[in-house]
Amino acid sequence: MPADESRLHRAARLRRIFRALHARNYRLYLGGQSLSFIVTWMQRVALNWWVYRVTHSVLALGWLGFAGQIPALLLAPLAGALVDRWDRRWLLIVTQALAMLQAFVLAWLVLADVATLWQVVALSVVLGLINALDMPTRQALMMDLVDQPEDLSNALALNSTMTNGARLVGPTIVGLMIISVGEGRCFLLNGLSYLAVLAAIAAMRLPPRAAAAPRHLFW
């Protein structure tokens, strides 16, 4: 029947589009990260709003952005070397746990109404340092999450779609949250979202990596 053939064709096309999701480890990763990325974008927008509300300074917003980005630029070579040498799963657990702690400290400072601009900038530097290691770890771990090497490109495409979707959804939601509960609870929610990521990573069953030959850090 033509209708049956059309449905089979659509089903086959969907399987190709989402073929990386056949891998259990990748499903866990994408599920945990989808929630966390949305709330992370909520924190970014809420933090910018808090800084501007408190300081009424565009320059302060510039300092905040600079503080969050400069560590990744300076530490990229070192981070890549560490990712090659150390267990990627445990590196990701460490970076996510540290990011969770950063969010909780930020939430406490704002909710207790004791936060200052320079404390917030310092915490942005801390998060930038964490992200400098976190981003290459994610990229390297992706190869271990798919069942077939040919699914890697699809996994990267789905990950990019998820990231861009989070950029759209997070800022859309955070405006309502700021009005209703304030910036501090947005930061608290971000910290709690990392629990989903840590649970997903803990549930993964990854094959042991072959032992790497000892190498110097920069060559």
Give short role names for the model-derived ranges:
Residues 2-219:
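Alpha-helical transmembrane-bundle signature of multi-pass membrane transport and export proteins
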